[in-house]
Amino acid sequence: MSIITDPIADMLTRIKNATKRKHKSVNIPFSNKKLKIVEIIKKEGYISGYEIVGQGIEKKILITLKYKGNTSAIFDLKRISKPGLRVYTTASNIPSVLSGYGIAIISTSKGILTDKEARKENVGGEVIAYIW
């Protein structure tokens, strides 16, 4: 068993690999931050659903992936802010992903928000990832 230094990057990689292999679902080790990110991905329509399974140290998030025909709803995911190089943005400089076709996930003082929600709330923060 290896030590995961960036759990968010690990989660995004697991989702990306599962979509490339056309899996129906993927298991992610549980954390509250990951759960909030998964809730945003679900709300934006990139996954079919999720559920929390197990208890204690075995607690996981089971993500049900979404496909249209043979194509995944998620084209790609990219980790932006990393443990060695944090990326922050102000409210006036929030990035737009693929001219609005994708989403940026931003950790703000008001919680984890999409780029659209952060603009509406007029808050900046750490840019966690892009999804399109």
Swiss-Prot record:
Question: What Gene Ontology molecular-function terms does this entry list?
Answer: rRNA binding; structural constituent of ribosome
Q: Which InterPro entries match?
A: Ribosomal_uS8, Ribosomal_uS8_CS, Ribosomal_uS8_sf
User: PROSITE patterns given for it?
Assistant: RIBOSOMAL_S8
Q: Is Transmembrane tagged as a keyword?
A: no
Q: Which UniProt keywords apply?
A: Ribonucleoprotein, Ribosomal protein, RNA-binding, rRNA-binding
Note the superkingdom of the native organism: Bacteria
Looking up Gene3D superfamilies in the UniProt record yields: 3.30.1370.30, 3.30.1490.10
Q: Does the keyword Amino-acid biosynthesis apply?
A: no
**GO biological process terms held by the UniProt record:** translation
GO CC term, one of those recorded: ribonucleoprotein complex
Q: What does this protein do?
A: One of the primary rRNA binding proteins, it binds directly to 16S rRNA central domain where it helps coordinate assembly of the platform of the 30S subunit.
Which family does the UniProt entry place this protein in? Answer: Belongs to the universal ribosomal protein uS8 family.
Question: Which proteins does it associate with, and in what oligomeric form?
Answer: Part of the 30S ribosomal subunit. Contacts proteins S5 and S12.
Per its record, how is this protein called by name?
Small ribosomal subunit protein uS8
